[in-house]
Amino acid sequence: TPEHTARAKSILGPEKWLAVEQKVCLEESSSTARALGRAELERYLVLPNYRRCWLSLGFTEADLDDGGSDRFIDAMVVSGSMDQIQRRLDEHFDAGATHVCIQPVHPAGDLAAAERTLEAFAPG
């Protein structure tokens, strides 16, 4: 989240390079995007180190249970239009990120969707 980015930058200091990752789902249907996000995050939700980090960011156990609350999924996987997604990426830069790596979230096996997402947000 951009909040985590700001916390990391405050620890590293202004001169250090900070690369962060943001899961991106180029999908305007929130229910579809959340379903894809839940599938993507499922493996992380059982890992204690991830849960501790998310709890330290203000999420609750309830946010992390049962596949993740909508609030949690929306925070971890930005979705919507290109403009909506770009705003979240910009929030990371505003919070001190030097680089934001996007991780496409898409239907399993749909590499064309991943390529469309990467191309849409590629620099230059």
Segments from the language model and where they lie:
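Active-site-adjacent structural elements that line small-molecule/cofactor binding pockets in enzymes
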Residues: 1-124
